[in-house]
């Protein structure tokens, strides 16, 4: 297993022999700047991992190849669901072709989470402000990647995903680990009153008369409600909006923002 890379954070370093996982950032801060490409937004010259944000798919594919090589996962099929900000979870092990030789990229439709009990796949979800969560149960040998923006958090996708996995015996809440990645933190996630009315009040605050939502705290509470131990929940703590040198942010940079990823694979 490769050592931690400058362009991703490993949330489960103590389990390197069983799992490889990471929350990526916008690129290696020590790397020389990419040569300017006229007409290409600057974000796309960084480590953009989103195939559906307007970047050249070939360039995105090369970026993914860099991440997978740095993490020792090259050669494995990549599973990235086509997300809808909902609460559905795809099972990579049940995807067509999953038992034989799947293509390099599998994109299950209409899911914002994906799980697997196999070492064949790299599971990933992408984001540019939304929270992502990685799930790993070292005893059961199950991994999952979850995309939970405010809509997914409202739909309780992390809670539902954990309950589905526990209900099918694929994780045990007392042994499962949950890692929360970089996202808009409460001080940066300003919302209007119409959105605030849809969210649990205990995770809302007022800053300068405006509503703010604590997305990580809400998802942490969902994990605890499923029986995940508090000491098994780890939060990277980074804010995408406030750290432009390390993270893309749709709210800060607009539609041409790149995308980061949360990825995980059994070894």
Q: Where do the PLM segments sit?
A:
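Active-site microenvironment for binding and transforming phosphate-containing groups
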Residues: 1-267
């Amino acid at each position: 297993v490769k050592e931690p890379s400058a362009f991703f954070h490993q949330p489960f370093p103590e389990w390197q022999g069983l799992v490889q996982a990471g929350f990526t950032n916008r690129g290696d801060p020590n790397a020389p700047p990419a040569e300017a490409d006229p007409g290409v937004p600057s974000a796309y010259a960084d480590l953009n991992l989103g195939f559906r944000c307007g970047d050249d798919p070939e360039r995105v594919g090369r970026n993914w190849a860099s991440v997978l090589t740095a993490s020792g996962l090259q050669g494995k099929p990549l599973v990235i669901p086509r997300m809808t900000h909902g609460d559905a979870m795809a099972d990579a092990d049940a995807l067509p072709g999953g038992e034989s030789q799947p293509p390099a990229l599998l994109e299950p439709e209409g899911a914002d989470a994906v799980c697997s009990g196999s070492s064949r796949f790299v599971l990933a979800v992408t984001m540019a402000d939304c929270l992502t969560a990685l799930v790993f149960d070292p005893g059961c040998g199950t991994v999952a990647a979850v995309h939970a923006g405010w809509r997914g958090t409202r739909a309780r996708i992390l809670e539902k995903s954990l309950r589905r996995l526990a209900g099918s015996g694929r994780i045990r809440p007392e042994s499962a680990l949950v890692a929360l990645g970089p996202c808009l933190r409460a001080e940066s996630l300003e919302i209007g009153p119409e959105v605030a009315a849809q969210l649990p009040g205990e995770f809302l605050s007022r800053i300068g008369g405006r509503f703010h939502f604590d997305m990580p705290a809400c998802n942490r509470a969902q994990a605890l409600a499923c029986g995940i131990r508090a000491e098994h929940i780890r939060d990277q703590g980074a804010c995408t909006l406030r750290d432009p040198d390390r993270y893309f942010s749709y709210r800060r940079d607009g539609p041409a923002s790149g995308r980061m990823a949360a990825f995980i694979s059994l070894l």
